[in-house]
Amino acid sequence: MFAITTWKENWEPNVCFHGWSCFHGDKTAFFAVMGNLYQHTHTYANIQRDQCFCINFLPISYYDRLVETIHHNEEKEDEFAVGNFTLEEAKTIHAPVIQEAFMNIECSLKEMKDLSGAGITSMVIGQVQHISVEEEYARGDEKRYGKDGFMMLVPGQQNLVTGEAGQSAVATVNIEKYD
């Protein structure tokens, strides 16, 4: 889980707490692929308009502050102030960056694709332009995994016998074995 940051149309900073992504690349380029971004949101409109966004990874201790931005995300609201985040300018794109994040990934928009054609969600692909990582996170896996590292969304598990949906959860990653 991470925060997508963009500028709103009125130049207020936007924070979108998001939980679906993967990252791909080769020797020529690296990409952030975000699934299930709702098309009716200002985050979607901001990315479409400005052709860029930043992905900000924060530890689970910031969870409640990120959720607060969901409840106070009107166009006129400064979502950095709502979440009590420090705003910095991105180095290579026109987007705000959360200074408290241990990793920021600056992306230019490569493609938006409505896979179902229903006009509800889109897959958003960003080409990575720059990555900033705090040194203690860059030097090894000790800080990246565990309570100070990446958050993961654990979707509500469905009971395969009854069809009843379970509650979603937020987890941190614990390395169990090296191979």
What are these regions (language model features)?
Residues 1-179:
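Basic, polyanion-binding surface patches
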